[in-house]
Amino acid sequence: MGDLSNRARKILFAAVTEFIATGDPVGSRTLARKYGLDLSAASIRNVLADLEEAGYLHQPHTSAGRIPTDRALRLFIDALVELRSLSPEQQAELSARFTEIYAGANDPLRETGRYLSELSGAAAVVAAPRAELRALAQLRFIPTKPGQLLAVLVFADGSVANRFISVDEAINEGELTRIHNLLTDVIEGRTLGEIRDLFARRLADERLQIDALRRRAFELGSKATADVTPRSEVVIEGQNRLIDLPEYADVDRLKKLMKALEEREELVDLLDRTLAAGAGEVTVFVGSEAGDLGGGQLSLVAAPYMENGRVAGTVGVLGPTRMDYAKVMPLVDATAAAMTEVRGKVK
């Protein structure tokens, strides 16, 4: 903010606030009338012209007012670093709703998205925990043909991953049962990443060479869990709220948006970058900062949630660059905290 005077910054933030509220280009008379700037419309107009020249505002038509650029929105968002917290009543309502969702919903991630979309008035995105951080509940082997087993990995969240693995020697039913029992004890309470590490350590232990059954169990387990990367589910709810935006009245722009939401590569990349920020951090990607997602017309506000004491997945709001950041940022922050709390209780 060092390149702006206090007066210029005050006028710029008033322009951003008005644009967020109305979605319309902002004129000097509106700012003079509504924001108590103690300046004439002519003085404000001169400052707006300077802000436009500095890259903070854009005038779509010479006769129209001005709209904030991504640079102005970023400046405004950074000034909101002290998030406005939800009221105790709002926080209690949020926690109670998530307790209901995780206690009874068949698809809690989707229900979370629907609820957040409703609260924010924008689209909501929820990413399931990354594979290596997801707890494994069961590991089973099913003989399919000589020299081959089907490994079935059942995660604690109910998702399943299957893969075929080759075996050098036939395994009878009794031996397979003992292997299942042994691996059940080993994987209990551990994530996929922890289980992979455990198998590697056990197989490197020379003392295991004399225990043929245990060694075979860990060899099968290692094969079954190696490179298993069930794609983390990314739920998007409230897409219609994006489609209905005037920013996407243009058909070609709308087609690009729908393609981006369907393929989700840009979105997944942004969510991964949010994970890297760590717990308790709300990350905002404004317009062009979100890459090709939304053609520069959208912003993503996202935060990680925790599971098993680790950063696991992300939750966020996807909306127009003129979204109400002062409302959405604390809402996303509180949602991530509520998800962390509830997921720690519901297994």
Swiss-Prot record:
SUPFAM superfamilies: GAF domain-like, Winged helix' DNA-binding domain
Keywords: Repressor, Stress response, Transcription, Transcription regulation
GO molecular function list: DNA binding
InterPro entries tied to this protein: GAF-like_dom_sf, HrcA, HrcA_C, WH-like_DNA-bd_sf, WH_DNA-bd_sf, WHTH_transcript_rep_HrcA_IDD
Family: Belongs to the HrcA family.
Function as written in the Swiss-Prot or TrEMBL entry: Negative regulator of class I heat shock genes (grpE-dnaK-dnaJ and groELS operons). Prevents heat-shock induction of these operons.
Entry-linked HAMAP family: HrcA (MF_00081)
Protein name: Heat-inducible transcription repressor HrcA
Protein species of origin: Sorangium cellulosum (strain So ce56)
Highest classification ranks of the organism: Bacteria, Pseudomonadati, Myxococcota, Polyangia, Polyangiales
Name of the encoding gene: hrcA
